[in-house]
UniProtKB/Swiss-Prot annotation:
Covalent S-S links between cysteines: none
InterPro entries, per the entry: Alsin_GEFs/MotNeuronReg (IPR051984), DBL_dom_sf (IPR035899), DH_dom (IPR000219), MORN (IPR003409), PH-like_dom_sf (IPR011993), RCC1/BLIP-II (IPR009091), Reg_chr_condens (IPR000408), VPS9 (IPR003123)
Name listed for the protein in its UniProt record: Alsin
Job description of the protein: May act as a GTPase regulator. Controls survival and growth of spinal motoneurons.
Gene Ontology BP annotations: behavioral fear response; endosomal transport; endosome organization; locomotory behavior; lysosomal transport; neuromuscular junction development; neuron projection morphogenesis; positive regulation of GTPase activity
Residue ranges annotated for the VPS9 domain, each copy included: 1513-1657
């Protein structure tokens, strides 16, 4: 609260705010007095009951005054001064309310408190007569799970009930009576219940009368509306009926359902069981009689009306009797809703009527102007207008066809005045004197009783025999009661047919929901819902029936009601247009008018000049706060007046039928009025320093401004839009846009006016003014409107309107002058109309002026002063800016009037404005022809070069202007550059050159910034740049360039050429999106080319250079092929992968390898999926040429020569069973020539062979069978030759490594500068990061950190050490982890080609040695790259000396000597390519490599595994004995889970368990070094286990160690131990072989072979 006090109250002191003045109701002359005993606290809100009141102060405290019988102490029952409600101390109360004898308050945390009389449960406490202190009311939503406490926003209290509005905009009720809106017969209701009928709707406010309730509800958005059903959901009867009589047709929407509410589908189940009382029959008879009345002849009118009168009287008597009996159940209630298209039918009937409009000039007052149909349209129609209209048309057509044309003459001869009948039927009796509360004079004492009125009306009805002009009906606002039997009309079918053909222009001027504004400001799209007792018509439904549930008062739809007040037995509704509708009891003139009936809302006649902005309703009087000329609110009183001495008023004149202005201007500025039973109260502010006066001025002028805008909209804009032949489509669209923007602005002003009224009721902090906090809403709306109206002006809209609108304007000239505030009678109509349309812009000056006034009320240093000052400047600045926009539009319009007509049509655009042209500023084209005419016109969006009848338009966004230097010979020259043109303009003088250059530069700058319609908020003038940027974003369509003809480019430009990111689209569907450089595609981009033949498109994503594909990219062909790899000059060049077809297609295949000029050349792998073959070898001109290897899925292996895609020349062929042919080939798998065929058993044939392998081979040669005594060493000599005819490992994938060297800036391996290589790496990383930033794939935090760390180049100064070696190792790990780094890209590619080669068909055991050689080649070539980047790195096999001795020494496992680095031949770290790179490379290549090892060792592994399974069946003791382990090494006891257990003969898998577990880890490691460490750790675990059992130090010998290690290997059960052994052997560093780890590895290898030879006895 401190901040609130510090704000605007500092300017004038809080003691001058919220002063309380109180009057006695009806006492004249008025004697206002200060509230007795009240101190100086500022009161924000007051509420009055019958004999008590409640005050809410600024600091959230609540005081009670008056008679308080519920208080416990006898002294406090009637205190002399207001007393503080101590129970609420500590709570910050935000609102209070009072009923007749109880009170309520709501705290800022949404808790409602009630106290006072509780006889009807109105305080939500059970079985308690009084609630002496404020008691919190527990309100919980039972539908929510778990139960949630409902937070309350507002309370309203009646005599016996209370309503609470929750923060979720739902109504909760408790107390007694039908006014609760709950379906229950058990009263009182002491537990708050939700009013389900309004659940799901947004309720804005609730109000309570004595026994009725009102709710202000926001209209449903149009998308939520459901179509109107044809039939009632309850009784399935038609909602609209048509009755065909002899000479007329009756259309009726008089259908009604029980309970007086229209039940929706969702409520049908809940309420279907409600019983109907016998009185429903009476009402049905009334309806029947009423229909008969409408169709009666003149002679029978009186008889029928008397019958109706009798029915009404009997009905009233019945309901009065029910009230006397005190029954709580309402036996009969009716809801007869208006059909949504009532007004549409009215429209038809208005056109049929030939009668003139009869204006009611009673009391000499000006009649309410007839409002157009659409202004009165109901906002929440349950169906779209088109649907409703079509439904109506179909109904009309059916009517017309039902009766003959001859009926028309009978009908048109005469009919009954529908209006008069409805007037008489609407008059309903007052409530009885008992219920009328304090009314001294009962209904029986009134001279003009209801019965008398019925008789008078029936007599008038007898005289009337003319067709009522339906427009007259509309003139009387609200005379039709839409909730009674409504649309009962007699319609001539002939005229209906005629009317059905009439087409009117549909104009919607109600703005749609505007999101932000609707969230910040009060909504004007509201409905009024009422329920409870209606004996005095206080529900507004046109009858005196009670309603158990809320029912919408349809005739208030579209009236923009913003506030409701409920008196004892009457109701008031305040609209945004400062009008008040009133209905209900008018016994004392409390409605502010004397019109009948009072059962429907009618306009109160308070002040003809001033609008109402606040209202209050007492028991039998009303109060109206009105705007006056000096902005000080005036207070009008209407209602009961206590006769003073000497007054001889008749009994029925105890009230004021006309509101009386109370003279209370001396009090100050009234901010709020509150009414009770016998007294009313006003909260008054003193005008210190003019602050309050300025606030009232702002609010008053805003409300008046809204009324004026509403009048313009309804009386000028809508009629104009409905005119025919308004000109071209563009003009009509522009006018409709003007109307739409005007309507939006008008609605915003209405909302703001309503919010200012609420603002004046509150704390009145300047900083919370919407016009300050959300100024952009207003600034944008005014700017949008100004844009649309100036566009309309430029296109000559007002001139085009002149002809079709002349009649309308002439008839309404006086109205036009009045609205536009033009006093000169000689002003032309079009000028007046122009002035009228620009009228709203003037309001901005008013905002600025009032905000400046408010600012002067504060200290200059205060934030309020600064904010008000800034906002004032903003509004003033916008007003001036929009004024300039208007002048620009008028200047442009004048230019178009003089411009040649043919070119005008193509150049004239709504948003185009003229800046300058060369006819008045001499400018010529350099080197122009002698007789040529060149006219240059500068618009805000283009420079136009006109020549005779032709012209060319240069958009400013892609135009560059620069002055020519004097050296170039152009003293007065301007160089103009556009994407496809470059020309020089010569001005007559240097001054002209400067003017043109400045004009063009500013225009280009404005076009680029899009500021043509944006106001320079917050500054005095627009800050123009000296020159527009050379680099900019723009869109352009090429028209000359052959390559780009008709293509459209949208993106970045630099000096007339595309440069930067952009999108280029060709008319034939081609599109490039990516980077440009100097007008050409350059950098990363995406290219699409449609393939019309295949109805697909080619798609390329990758790098470009100088307009051509160059670098890495992916090309997806329309045929389904995909190429990923390198490009050069739009051709595949370098390393790449081509996928052809899919597995399901006719010829799926895959090639990965080198390309040269779009053809396969060099080494590559081709996988023919259809034939199940894989070729790994050399290519030339797209064919296999040179050495290569082929493997098939059937196990065939060929290596040798290829020529033109065929096996031709020497080669070696192996089959799955190890049959080998080595010799000459002539075709694929075709032997031809000399060779040797070797059988699996070693027998071989030498000679000449011919034929295809697998289909019979002719042999001419010698068969050899080797001697039994020949050595086994010579048998596999052919296997040792494998690989000799394959491509050497170092020749494979050269293109991949060459690409990496190229990325580092080297022409060949090692040929380049190191610093340049590092620069290229940094550029590659930065570029890749930028591309990834724009791509949908977002890098993770760790990836981003890795990239950032890679941008730092490792610096090494001084001697090379282990630490520096470790830095390089860490850098390589990071670099190889990210494909954005050249090394990472290399590794990723190598992994891809390796897998491609050795997976699938390539998983052939014959390829193992090739695979191993390939890895070793990778290591050698990558190591070369690393040594180039880190020149200080020693050569392969060099030793790095240790900088310090190892901190802990251990004994050598093998020798027992103390050794720090027994693996190395000398102390230090040995540098090897495998040691540095295998940890990076091998984990990625491990799966395919290990698979080859497993395939190659398959037979050995099977024998080994069989032995392992067999030997592992034995218990530990038996196995140790069998393997020959010395007894001293047998564990005697074992520690299991900390418990020592003896080793039994049956114990299994327990001995040396830790060593076994350790050795099993060998399968989880990748590199030989890691596997060797596991082996070493296993030996150490064995040693630890033996030491624990021997309790003494010892030295292993191999005889002791081998059996124990053999036991561990067996128990470890490693499935592919042979593969592990061979992998280590092939890839381990040679220097390790003779060290400790080498010996341990040899031991493991020996165990592997030993296990295969073990036999178990």
């Amino acid at each position: 609260m401190d901040s609130k006090k510090r704000s605007s109250t500092e300017a004038e002191g809080s003691k001058e705010r919220g002063l309380v003045h109180i009057w006695q109701a009806g006492s004249f002359p008025i004697t206002p007095e200060r509230l007795p005993g009240w101190g100086g606290k500022t009161v924000l809100q007051a509420a009055l009951g019958v004999k008590h009141g409640v005050l809410l102060t600024e600091d959230g405290e609540v005081y009670s005054f008056g008679t308080l019988p519920w208080r416990s102490g006898p002294v406090e029952i009637c205190p002399s001064s207001p007393i503080l409600e101590n129970a609420l101390v500590g709570q910050y109360v935000i609102t209070v309310a009072t009923g007749s004898f109880h009170s309520g308050a709501v705290t800022d945390n949404g808790v409602a408190y009630m106290w006072g009389e509780n006889s009807a449960g109105q305080c939500a406490v059970a079985n308690q007569q009084y609630v002496p202190e404020p008691n919190p009311v527990s309100i919980a939503d039972s539908e929510a799970s778990p139960l949630l406490a409902v937070r309350i926003l507002q309370l309203a209290c009646g005599e016996e009930h209370t309503l609470a509005l929750s923060i979720s905009r739902e109504i909760w009720a408790w107390g007694t009576g039908c006014q609760l809106g709950l379906i229950t017969t058990a009263f009182p209701v002491t537990k708050p219940q939700k009013v389900e009928h309004l659940a799901g709707r947004v309720v804005l406010q609730v109000a309570c009368g004595a026994f009725h309730s009102l709710a202000l509800v926001q209209c449903l958005p149009s998308q939520d509306l459901k179509p109107v059903p044809e039939r009632c959901n309850q009784c399935s009867q038609l909602l609209i009926t048509m009755t065909d009589k002899e000479d007329h047709v009756i259309i009726s929407d008089s259908h009604c359902c029980p309970l007086g509410v229209t039940l929706t589908e969702s409520q049908a189940e809940n309420h279907a069981s409600t019983a109907l009382s016998p009185s429903t029959e009476t009402l049905d008879r009334q309806e029947e009689v009423f229909e008969n009345t409408l169709v009666a002849n003149d002679q029978s009118v009186a008889t029928e009306l008397n019958a109706v009168s009798a029915q009404i009287t009997s009905s009233d008597a019945m309901s009065s009797q029910q009230n006397v009996m005190g029954t709580t159940e309402i036996s009969s209630a009716r809801n007869i809703p208006s059909y949504p298209d009532t007004q549409a039918v009215n429209e038809y009937l208005r056109k049929l009527s030939d009668h003139s409009v009869r204006e009611d000039s009673e009391h000499g007052e000006k009649p309410v102007p007839s409002q157009p149909l659409l202004e009165e349209a109901i906002p929440n129609l349950h169906s779209p207008p088109t649907t409703s209209t079509s439904a109506l048309n179909s109904l009309v057509v059916s009517c017309a066809s039902a009766v003959g044309v001859r009926v028309a003459a009978t009908y048109e001869a005469g009919a009954l005045s529908l209006k008069k009948v409805m007037n008489f039927y609407s008059t309903t009796p007052c409530e009885t004197g008992a219920q009328a509360g304090s009314s001294a004079i009962g209904p029986e004492g009134l001279k003009d009783s209801r019965e008398e009125q019925v008789k008078q009306e029936s007599m008038q009805g007898k005289k009337s025999s003319s067709l009522v002009d339906i427009r007259e009906e509309e003139t009387e606002g609200g005379s039709r009661r839409l909730s009674l039997p409504g649309l009962l009309s007699q319609v001539s079918p002939r005229l209906l047919r005629k009317a059905a053909r009439v087409k009117t222009r549909t104009v919607v001027l109600t703005p749609t929901y505007s999101g932000e504004a609707d969230a910040l400001l009060p909504s004007l799209r509201t409905e009024v819902w009422t329920w409870g007792k209606g004996k005095e018509g206080q529900l507004g439904h046109g009858d005196v029936l009670p309603r158990l549930q809320p029912l919408c008062v349809k005739c208030l739809d579209g009236k923009e009601v913003i506030h409701l007040e409920a008196g004892g037995y009457h109701s008031l509704a305040l609209t945004a247009k400062s009008q008040v509708y009133s209905w209900g009891s008018n016994t004392f003139g409390q409605l502010g008018h004397s019109d009948f009936p009072t059962t429907v809302p009618r306009l109160a006649k308070i002040s003809s000049e001033n609008g109402v902005w606040s209202i209050a309703a007492g028991r039998d009087y009303s109060l109206f706060l009105v705007d006056t000329e000096d902005f000080q609110p005036g207070l009008y009183y209407s209602g009961r007046q206590d006769p003073t001495e000497g007054d001889n008023l008749p009994e029925n004149h105890s009230g004021s039928k006309t509101p009386v202005l109370l003279s209370c201007s001396k009090l100050g500025y009234i901010s709020r009025v509150t009414a009770g039973k016998d007294s009313y109260l006003a909260l008054v502010d003193k005008n210190i320093m003019g602050y309050i006066a300025s606030l009232h001025e702002l609010a008053t002028t805003e409300r008046r401004f809204y009324s004026k805008l509403s009048d313009i909209k309804s009386q000028i804009l809508r009629p104009l839009l409905s005119l025919e032949n308004l000109g071209t489509t563009t003009t009509v669209q522009l006018l409709q846009e003007v109307a739409s923007r005007f309507s939006k602005l008008c609605y915003l002003i209405g909302q703001h006016g309503a919010s200012l009224s609420s603002f004046l009721h509150g704390v009145k902090e300047a900083r919370s003014l919407v016009i300050l906090k959300h100024s952009s809403l207003f600034l944008d709306s005014y700017t949008e409107y100004c844009t649309s109206i100036t566009n309309f002006l430029v296109m000559g809209g007002f001139q085009l309107l002149a002809k079709p609108a002349i009649d309308f304007l002439n008839k309404n000239q006086e109205l036009l002058q009045d609205l536009s505030e033009v006093n000169d009678e000689n002003t032309q109509l079009m000028e007046i109309l122009n002035t009228l349309f620009f009228l709203p812009i003037r309001r901005l000056h008013n905002y600025a002026k009032v905000l400046l006034k408010l600012a002067t009320c504060f200290e200059v240093a205060s934030p309020e002063y600064q904010k008000l000052q800034d906002s004032s400047s903003c509004y003033e600045c916008l007003a001036l800016h929009l004024g300039r926009k208007r002048k620009e539009a008028e200047y442009t319009l004048g230019f178009w009037k003089t411009f040649p007509g043919k070119m005008t049509d193509s150049l004239r655009k709504p948003e185009r404005r003229l800046l300058c042209e060369s006819s008045n500023r001499a400018l010529s084209l350099q080197h122009a022809g002698r007789f040529s005419v060149n006219w240059f016109i500068l618009f805000n969006d283009a420079l136009v070069h006109a020549q005779f009848s032709t012209h060319h338009v240069f958009p400013l966004a892609t135009l560059w202007a620069e002055p020519l230097s004097e050296e170039a010979g152009g003293v007065n020259g301007l160089k103009i550059t556009t994407p496809e043109e470059q020309f020089t303009l010569i001005s007559s003088t240097p001054q002209e050159k400067t003017k043109w250059l400045r004009a063009i530069s500013q225009a280009v700058d404005q076009a680029l910034r899009g500021m043509s319609d944006l106001p320079p908020y917050g500054s005095g003038s627009s800050v123009q740049r000296q020159e527009p940027p050379i680099s900019r974003s723009a869109k352009y369509t090429f028209y000359k360039d052959p390559r780009l003809k008709d293509a459209t480019y949208d993106g970045r430009w630099l000096s007339g050429k595309p440069h930067g990111r952009g999108v280029l689209k060709w008319p034939d569907g081609k599109m490039y999106s990516g980077m440009f450089r100097n007008g050409l595609e350059d950098g990363y981009g995406e290219y699409r080319i449609p393939n019309k033949a295949m109805n697909k498109e080619d798609h390329y994503v990758g790098h470009w250079k100088e307009g051509k594909m160059c670098g890495q990219g992916v090309y997806s062909y329309a045929s389904g092929e995909v190429f990923e790899g390198c490009f050069q000059d739009n051709m595949r060049h370098g390393h790449g992968l081509l996928r052809s077809g899919k597995l399901t297609s006719s010829s799926p295949s895959m090639f990965i390898g080198q390309w040269v000029m779009d053809k396969k050349a060099g080494y590559g792998v081709f996988d023919d999926i259809t034939r199940g073959e894989k070729y790994m070898g050399m290519w030339q001109d797209d064919v296999c040429q040179g050495n290569g290897v082929v493997v098939t899925q059937f196990g065939l292996y060929y290596e040798g020569n290829f020529h033109l895609n065929k096996m031709m020349g020497n080669g070696v062929l192996l089959s799955e069973d190890d049959t080998i042919y080595e010799g000459e080939f002539s075709d694929d798998w075709t032997l031809s020539g000399k060779g040797t065929l070797t059988m699996p058993n070693g027998d071989y044939i030498e000679g000449y062979f011919s034929g295809e392998w697998g289909s019979g081979i002719k042999i001419t040669g010698t068969y050899f069978k080797p001697s039994l005594y020949e050595s086994d060493k010579d048998r596999p000599k052919v296997f040792r030759k494998l690989g000799n005819l394959a491509v050497p490992a170092d020749e494979k994938w050269k293109a991949v490594f060459d690409e990496c060297w190229r990325q580092l800036g080297c022409e060949g391996p090692g040929q380049g500068e190191v610093w340049k290589a590092w620069d290229n790496i940094a550029v590659a990383l930065t570029t890749s990061r930028r591309q990834h930033r724009d791509s949908p794939e977002i890098l993770s935090r760790s990836q981003t950190q890795t990239l950032e760390s890679l941008e730092f180049i490792p610096q090494h100064v001084g001697a090379f050490s282990v630490e520096k070696y470790d830095d390089i190792r860490k850098y390589l790990i990071k670099a190889c982890d990210t494909p954005l780094h050249p090394l990472g890209r290399l590794v990723e590619t190598l992994v891809a080609v390796y897998r491609m080669t050795y997976v699938g068909v390539g998983a052939n055991r014959r390829l193992l040695q090739e695979a191993v050689k390939e890895i070793k080649s990778y290591l050698k070539r990558i190591f070369q790259l690393v040594r180039f980047l880190f020149p200080e790195l020693p050569e392969e096999g060099s030793t790095i000396p240790l900088s310090a001795p190892l901190p802990t020494e251990r004994k050598s496992f093998c020798t027992g000597k103390s050794d720090s680095r027994s693996e190395s031949p000398e102390p230090g770290y040995v540098v090897t390519s495998s040691g540095l790179l295998l940890p990076v490379l091998l984990p990625r290549l491990y799966p395919p490599l290990f698979m080859l090892y497993a395939l190659d060792n398959d037979r050995e592994e099977d024998i080994y595994w069989e032995c392992v399974l067999r030997l592992n069946k034995q218990p530990d003791i038996a196995l140790l004995g069998f393997l020959g382990v010395q007894r001293k090494f047998w564990p005697a006891t074992l520690s299991i889970l900390g418990e020592s257990k003896k080793v039994l003969p049956t114990t299994k898998d327990a001995c040396f368990a830790s060593a076994v577990e350790c050795l099993q880890q060998i399968s989880t490691t990748f590199t030989p070094s890691d596997k060797l460490k596991v082996i070493q750790q296993t030996f150490e675990e064995i040693s630890q286990s033996v030491l624990a059992s021997l309790h003494e130090d010892f030295l292993w010998s191999m005889d002791d160690l081998f059996p124990v290690f053999l036991y561990v290997v067996l128990r470890a059960r490693i499935r592919n131990l042979g593969s592990e052994v061979h992998l280590i052997e092939d890839l381990m560093d040679p220097y390790l072989q003779h060290g400790e780890q080498g010996i341990m590895f040899t031991t493991l290898k020996a165990c592997y072979y030993q296990i295969q030879r073990e036999k178990l006895n």
